[in-house]
Amino acid sequence: MSRDYSYEIYSLRQQISTMSSERADILNKISILKQNKSKIQSKKSAISEQLSQYDLIKAKATSNFAGNRRDDFNNKVETLKGSISQWLKNTQNNIDLIDQKISTYTAEASNLAIGMNYASQSLNTYIYLQSQNED
């Protein structure tokens, strides 16, 4: 009496299809994260460049202000520099979190690929066994 492997074949095909869909979703998320990370890094670099120019602005404005007005201007520039420096640090932390998420998703995609490979090998075995039963 021969065994019917139809259920195993069907089940493995469903599992492979599900894993393939999940992997495609994850790869899409990785792509989006990488694109957005690039945009964030570009903006961060531009703002960092602008921050380096603030001391030049202060130096150029020396003749326009004197006394308390000068001190107020310098304080405002320093406060702005501090706020921007904090923003740059926070942005770098966010970039690091994006990198961690990309690594996590990459590992998940790799695990799904391994699972799909194993399921495909099992599927091929069951298809072979089923074909032997039909002979």
Question: Could you say what each language-model-derived stretch is?
Answer:
Residues I9, R13-I16, K37, K44, ...:
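Generic structural concept
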Residues K29-K60:
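Alpha-helical segments in soluble extracytoplasmic regions
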Residues E49-L80:
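Short coil/loop "hinge" linkers that interrupt or connect long alpha-helical coiled-coils or helical hairpins
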Residues E108-D135:
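Preference for long, well-ordered alpha-helical segments
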